[in-house]
């Protein structure tokens, strides 16, 4: 049975992360009663490693065994408070055990010998750390920073806690995670003067891509700050990095799930697939093979999903492009599906939402892909000008090329996500063509908003509420119960 060992520094004696320590030996009652709790040993005590004779007794768990299984299967954590009191916490999910010990082991010596320069205040390790072992090489500590960042990310994502970074040392950044304990009423209260402190060397994390690849089934790395994010928690965070706020790409299926009320989504034209109309020649990979591999990778037939559903009870027609399918490129199938969606919305007098995420027209289909720009713009003109219906365009990163030049910028209301890359031609193409440098950030959503090309920049979390208010402002209201078919 393999164990993993992690080193944590707790800034308060009471360990409140998912459990609460009671100083009373007589009281033992779960804080949150659940039918599926982790089995714990009531005889286990947390003894003080200092000179005091007091100790903490009994652990009341706030997490079910189901939650822990999603996190970790068999692991041991070393915990130390601000008074250098040290404890060992062991999880064995298979046998449903949760044990806390205070026995010093070689592994504890190994991890406790790891100190940052600011924590030691530039003093000698041998003078300040009784457990310091000079025979242990510093190279062994590289994985500790990586694992600390993994657990650090999980704490924030699954336990309703927030964080910010402070840097008071040249050698490392300290991550102070402020614990928010969820009360029974569902409200979040902040535990006063409590924080979990982990040491994380950001430069080591950026360089250590090999370790990240070994855990890629559990963690995903932010493209901006290179922080590790727990994959299962990423969906609940709407694919937003909790460290730097960077907006990671989100699949079309996940976006539909976030936007449309459960059980109301009705897809359209799912059986429409691309062919090779111009017999495009490629030295690397045939066009049809690329389509087949993209279909296997995404589970989609092409780079857009269209259909109807309800957004907070309001019937809408929705089209969502998926960048994972050949860069969200617009071919004949994408153009036809969007055209049919607009025509259906025109007939049924539905408000229209198109979520753009595309690299532009699909070059493998030549002029057939370019004509989709005119075809979609034509039906949009009838939808907006003749029928006086309401179209919202949502631009995500990246939105470029033919999509930007056509329906992407034709919305009655144009909304962009924060930091979205929106352009007609990419930075590299412009610089190679015009021989001029493109200013940094000039193609970001914030720059376009200042220049009047966008109506608003809305984060993912409040987007559904903003869309609801816009629809109600334009006289689109939720269906009554009697009107729901």
Curated annotation (Swiss-Prot):
One of its GO terms (cellular component) is acetyl-CoA carboxylase complex. Its main location: plastid. InterPro entries: AcCoA_carboxyl_beta, Acetyl_CoA_COase_Trfase_b_su, ClpP/crotonase-like_dom_sf, COA_CT_N. The keyword Nucleotidyltransferase does not apply. Pathway: Lipid metabolism; malonyl-CoA biosynthesis; malonyl-CoA from acetyl-CoA: step 1/1. Zn(2+) binds at residues 222, 225, 241, 244. It comes from the Eukaryota. Its EC number is 2.1.3.15. A zinc finger (C4-type) spans 222-244. Acetyl-CoA carboxylase is a heterohexamer composed of biotin carboxyl carrier protein, biotin carboxylase and 2 subunits each of ACCase subunit alpha and ACCase plastid-coded subunit beta (accD). Belongs to the AccD/PCCB family. This is Acetyl-coenzyme A carboxylase carboxyl transferase subunit beta, chloroplastic. The gene is accD.
